């Protein structure tokens, strides 16, 4: 049985979204940064961070690198479902104006 390692992050496309799951720390941030940037293939990419389980300050550099890579490729990124621990780091490092965050990602719903 091939069980995913809970210590290794998963980055995968789910429709129009890019889902990031697991820890993002100094131990894996370079790999995660490269793997994530490779998925920026649409004009507007939604990055769902709701399943990120652990962060350290290196995630800030990852998000900024993703924004730079997306801008160079003509893409726009939107980060959604940000964990409180990451939101705190963004405030601590005073980069909230640089990182576009949507507080909660909701699907378009039709009134019945």
Where are the language model's segments positioned?
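STAS-like cytosolic regulatory interaction modules
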Residues: 1-55, 65-112
């Amino acid at each position: 049985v091939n069980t995913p390692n809970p210590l290794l992050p998963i980055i995968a496309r789910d429709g129009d979204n890019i889902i990031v799951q697991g820890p993002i720390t100094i131990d894996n941030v370079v790999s995660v940064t490269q793997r994530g940037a490779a998925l920026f293939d649409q004009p507007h990419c939604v990055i769902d961070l709701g399943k990120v389980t652990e962060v350290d300050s290196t995630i800030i550099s990852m998000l900024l690198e993703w924004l730079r890579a997306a801008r160079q490729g003509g893409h726009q990124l939107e980060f959604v479902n940000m964990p409180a621990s990451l939101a705190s780091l963004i405030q601590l490092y005073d980069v909230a104006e640089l990182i576009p965050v949507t507080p909660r990602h909701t699907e378009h719903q039709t009134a019945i």
